[in-house]
């Protein structure tokens, strides 16, 4: 024993401090083979045993597996098979309920068949078109109007059928007969498809003017102004170029014509008149309280060779003693109203034939200057 030499036969070499499965379960390999279970190979690969025989024994144990064990292990693994087409043989087995054991194609076909059945049984969330249910149970209907580019609210209804019918009515109104509705068998005749109005129709509607209900002022006709504005009564209105539009009355009611002969071939002419226009008092001039009032006279000139004058008079009104000349005026009026027709013609200054020839008014009594002269004392 020189220098601390160690006798190899006396002291055994040191072993690994790691405990392996073989020291605890010496019959582990046999039990795995009997139960067809695979042992953990990771411990064998990472075994740090220095013994060459132990390593060789582990390698030998790994190669001891049979082919049957491999088949049993891989049968339980679910394969990932992606097939695009179906085989007729496999579809026949699926339809008859016979499945190939261990065939991934059969499992894939079964899953696709189940999905097809679910999709066929699946229903729409809303059975009707254009409606949706509120959280509190009501049904709302709305439709998209392509002309406006927005959704049109149709309202809230108690049942889904009412909301669907409201959608159908709006769809027929917007799209006409091409609309997709919930109840195609029901046709509502009252709902008429409204087409978009054309620009031409809009222009025609805008061009139609509304009637004016207010009183309009029209210009006096030229032929009337030439015929009837020459007398003293019409001269008082000579400076007025407009008058209120009144209903037209034919001149044969008042006996005023335009140079007609005895045959009466000329047609009737008309002029504007108003109620109370035959009264010759001063009420229309603005000083009715001061001027004398005359009775109403309705005159008619007969178109024949002999001029006759028909009068309808009322009782003479009392005159107010507002001027010194009221007595003379009253006597003048009494003579003018109650005398014979010949005296009336003499008072007017011409007979009926002269009136027709000179185109003057036969009922001219006095001019506006005479009225102003009589009323100077009051003003």
UniProtKB/Swiss-Prot annotation:
Localisation per UniProt entry: Nucleus
Phenotypic consequence of gene deletion: Lethal when homozygous.
SUPFAM superfamilies assigned: DNA-binding domain (SSF54171)
Pfam family, one: AP2
GO molecular-function terms, A-Z: DNA-binding transcription factor activity; transcription cis-regulatory region binding
Induction: Up-regulated by darkness, ethylene and Botrytis cinerea.
Signal peptide: none
Superkingdom of origin organism: Eukaryota
InterPro entries given in the database record: AP2/ERF_dom, AP2/ERF_dom_sf, DNA-bd_dom_sf, ERF_plant
Biased composition (Polar residues): 190-206
GO BP term, pick one: regulation of gene expression
Record-annotated DNA-binding residue ranges: 127-184
Coiled coil spans: none
GO CC entries: nucleus
Main location: nucleus
Family according to the record: Belongs to the AP2/ERF transcription factor family. ERF subfamily.
Known role: Transcription factor involved in carotenoid biosynthesis regulation. Binds to the 5'-ATCTA-3' element present in the promoter of phytoene synthase (PSY) and phytoene desaturase (PDS). Involved in ethylene response and resistance to necrotrophic pathogens. Acts as a downstream regulator in the ethylene signaling pathway. Partially redundant with RAP2-12.
Database matches in PANTHER family: DNA-BINDING DOMAIN, ETHYLENE-RESPONSIVE TRANSCRIPTION FACTOR RAP2-2
Name of the molecule in the record: Ethylene-responsive transcription factor RAP2-2
């Amino acid at each position: 024993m020189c220098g601390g030499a160690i006798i190899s036969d006396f002291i055994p070499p040191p072993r690994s401090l790691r405990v392996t499965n073989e020291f605890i379960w010496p019959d582990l390999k046999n039990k795995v083979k009997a139960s067809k279970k695979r042992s953990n190979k990771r411990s064998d690969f990472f075994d740090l045993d220095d013994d060459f025989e132990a390593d060789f024994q582990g390698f030998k144990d790994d190669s001891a597996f049979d082919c049957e064990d491999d088949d049993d292990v891989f049968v339980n693994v679910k394969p990932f098979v992606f097939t695009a087409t179906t085989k007729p043989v496999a579809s026949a087995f699926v339809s008859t309920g016979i499945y190939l054991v261990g065939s991934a194609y059969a499992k894939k076909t079964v899953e696709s068949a189940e999905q097809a059945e679910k999709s066929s049984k699946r229903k729409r969330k809303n059975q009707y078109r254009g409606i949706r249910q509120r959280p509190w149970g009501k049904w709302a209907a709305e439709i998209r109007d392509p002309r406006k580019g927005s959704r049109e609210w149709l309202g809230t209804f108690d049942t889904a059928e009412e909301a669907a019918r409201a959608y159908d009515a709006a769809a027929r109104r917007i799209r006409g007969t091409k609309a997709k509705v919930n109840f195609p068998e029901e046709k509502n005749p009252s709902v008429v498809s409204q087409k978009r109005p054309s620009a031409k129709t809009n222009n025609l509607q805008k061009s139609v003017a509304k009637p004016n209900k207010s009183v309009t002022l029209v210009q006096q006709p030229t032929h009337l102004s030439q015929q009837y504005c020459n007398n003293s009564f019409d001269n008082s209105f000579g400076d007025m170029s407009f008058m209120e539009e009144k209903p037209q009355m034919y001149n044969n009611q008042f006996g005023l014509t335009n140079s007609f002969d005895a045959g009466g071939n000329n047609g009737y002419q008309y002029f504007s008149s108003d109620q109370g226009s035959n009264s010759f008092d001063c009420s229309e001039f603005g000083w009715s309280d001061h001027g004398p009032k005359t009775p109403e006279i309705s005159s008619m000139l007969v178109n024949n060779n002999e001029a006759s004058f028909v009068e309808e008079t009322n009782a003479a009104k009392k005159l107010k003693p507002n001027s010194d000349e009221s007595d003379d005026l009253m006597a003048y009026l009494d003579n003018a109203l109650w005398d014979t027709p010949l005296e009336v013609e003499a008072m007017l200054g011409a007979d009926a034939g002269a009136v027709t020839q000179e185109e003057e008014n036969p009922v001219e009594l006095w001019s506006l200057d005479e009225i102003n002269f009589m009323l100077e004392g009051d003003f």
